[in-house]
Structure formats: C-alpha cells, structure tokens
Amino acid sequence: MIKEVIVVEGRDDVTAVKRAVDAEIIAVGGFGINAKVINRIKEAQKRQGVIVLTDPDHAGEKIRRIISKRVPGIKHAYITQKEGFKDGDIGVENASPEVIIKALECAKCEIKEKRQEFDIQDLIYFKLTGDIKAKERREAVGRELGVGYSNSNQFLTRLNNYGITREEFIEAVKRIDV
C-alpha cells in the first residue's frame, strides 16, 4: 500500500489510480476546490504525506498550483500528454496502470503495510453504523479527525489508511458526545 494520499482531479482518475495501486485517494472535483477539500488534503499531508497526480493539461497544472500554494511540502507525480491520451482526450483516467505506477515511483512514494487498527465492531460500538444517527455521528467524527464524511466502509478505510490512533479516535468521539 502506498503511504501517501494521492490527490487527483475526478472520479475517473480515482478509478484509474485504484487499478494501478492500493492507496487512499482524494478527488478534488476540478476547479471547484473548496475549503473542505483543502482541509482534507492538509490533514492528509500532516498524517501521511500527499502526492498530487493531475491531468497533463492546462487545467491540471492550474489545480496542481492551487493545491501547492495552500498545502506546502506535497510531492508531485506527472504523466506526459502522450501517456494520458486516448480517443482525443487527455487525462490520468486514460493512463495505463504501468504509467501511473511509474509516475508515483518517480515522485518517491513510500510503501507501507496495510493497517487494520479498526474494524466494523468499532463503528457499531461507537454508533457510527447501525444506528439512526450513525450518518451524523460519522460526519462529526470525520470532521474532528480531518478525514471528511463517508459511508461506513469508506470511513473504516480512512481510519486505517490515515494512521488515526485509537486514542485520537476515542477523543474525537468524546468531543462529539459532549
């Protein structure tokens, strides 16, 4: 598993990266990078580091600059226009898994053991799934931990992939229960 969180532009890019590597991925949704997304990227940078992999075009470079300006110290992975070209379209979503792996290796990504600190029983115990207010509780805990909102399965993945400690998790739950 790649240690750093990979930041891409959109959902199709997420799919392409997931075909290539096991990693936590944030999709910024194009130019509409809002404060919530930037804060998730900042938190990811603090916890594991971030690698930005955007399309090899003007829009991709602009998004890369916006993120770089707001989140210092991130790494950058690049694909060429030729590597990302298919049927008249240029983008990460068109790159082969081999090209994406090579780009991440050039960005000096780190490999780590997949972590399983948390499981579904933790979410059930803390009423983050299987409870009428589970969605609101996950949203609040996600905000406290800087991992954002997600469904139960994705929330569990983020807890494990972002390196959240059990102590941090319990403290976040306590803060929302006040």
Model-predicted regions and their roles:
Residues M1-K3, T15, K36-R40:
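Phosphate-handling DNA/RNA-contact segment within nucleic-acid enzymes
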Residues M1-V5, Q48-I51:
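Short active-site oxyanion
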Residues I2-K3, A27-G32:
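Short, flexible loop segments at the rims of nucleotide/cofactor-binding pockets, characterized by
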